[in-house]
Amino acid sequence: MHYAIVEDRTEDQEYLSGLIREEHKKAGIPADFSCYPSGEAFLQEFTPGAFQAIFLDIMLDKNGLNGIETARRLRRLSKRIPIIFTTSELDFALEGYEVHPLDYLLKPVKPEKLAWCLQEIREYLAVPSCLTIPVSSGQGAAPINRPLSLDDILYVENPVTAC
């Protein structure tokens, strides 16, 4: 699995990536990382589908984007990617829920909490993000299976009123 770690403190990047690597080794799942010192650096290089999850420090460098604003901009690019906030303070917890994070990890991150979070990520990613539906192109034509992103579904209506 490929993770992005957005953290301005090198020692926190190394600590978190080490814990993730340990947990993945126990589970027999390979893990690799791309680390970014700022929200701006991360967003400049972000490509949808490149990461399975983003670990994002809320209290990034005061001169740039904080983690909440980085997450807001990220959500414009990818609605489904799991965001896990890391923080030493809970002051922004309520504001952070606006971007629908998968989890919050309080620093210093505890290995057992991280193990639970990584399992949560795997379960989240196991849910399909796309359906395949048959679409007919005309009378008598064989239906063709087309992918439909779950993010594109606004509502579903069932004209059948009886069960």
Regions found by a protein language model. Name each.
Residues E23-A31, D57-I68, R72, S137-P143:
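Short, charged helix-to-loop "capping" segments that act as catalytic/coupling loops
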Residues S17, D32-A53:
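Acidic, metal-coordinating helix/loop segments flanking the phosphotransfer/catalytic sites
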Residues W116-C163:
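Conserved binding/recognition cores within well-folded domains
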Residues Q44, F51-S129:
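CheY-like receiver
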Residues R9-S34:
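Two-component/phosphorelay signaling modules centered on CheY-like receiver
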Residues E7-R9, S88:
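Acidic di-acidic motifs
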Residues M1-A4:
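Non-catalytic signal-transmission and effector/linker regions of two-component phosphorelay proteins
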